[in-house]
Amino acid sequence: MDDKYFREDQWSISPYNFEESVLKRLELPSNVKIHDATLRDGEQTPGVVFRKEDKVRIARLLDEVGVDRIEAGMPAVSGEDFQAMKEITASGLKAEIFSFARALTGDIDKAVECGCTGVVIEIPIGYPKLVHQFGWTWEDVLRKSVNCLKYARKK
């Protein structure tokens, strides 16, 4: 089934994007940067595992098509991810290379060691996970977040 909001096996878009109330508030910036997370988020698909060579090749292809930022992976996850990211950052791409990191200083250090331009930092905020798995309070989350962001900015 094809219509103006959906093309089978190709793409879909919410019709709500074209609602008058949405369009009235729409203020597009003059410059948009494309941040691609294929190399990290794509590996979270069941059955998908990129080898180092795959990651480097995909990063080069993303750069060729003009992607501004490539989220190349999470170097704290494995030695192979770390090596792939080092190779990607050293390969002279025009794109900025970002790392994904938990809100841990060690993860930030790995991103810096790889030569990344920037880092996407995550911290869990789901209540059951915070309370039951980590034993954290909301204040702990805020404190850890602020401390990690300050640390990353210094690096």
Positions of the model-derived regions?
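An N-cap/entry alpha-helix motif that binds or orients negatively charged groups
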Residues: 1-23
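Alpha-helix-loop-beta-strand connector modules within alpha/beta enzyme cores
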Residues: 18, 78-102, 140-155
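N-terminal small/glycine-rich loop or linker at the start of catalytic domains
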Residues: 23-48, 120-134
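Hydrophobic faces of well-ordered beta-strands that scaffold small-molecule active sites
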Residues: 33-37, 68-72, 95-101, 117-121
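Non-membrane alpha-helical structural segments and their capping/turn regions in soluble enzymes
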Residues: 49-56, 82, 135-146
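Catalytic domains of carbohydrate-active enzymes, especially glycoside hydrolases
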Residues: 54-73, 110-118
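Glycine-rich, proline-tolerant flexible connector loops at the mouths of alpha/beta enzymes
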Residues: 67-93, 123-136
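Hydrophobic, small-residue-rich alpha-helical packing segments that form membrane-like cores
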Residues: 105-155
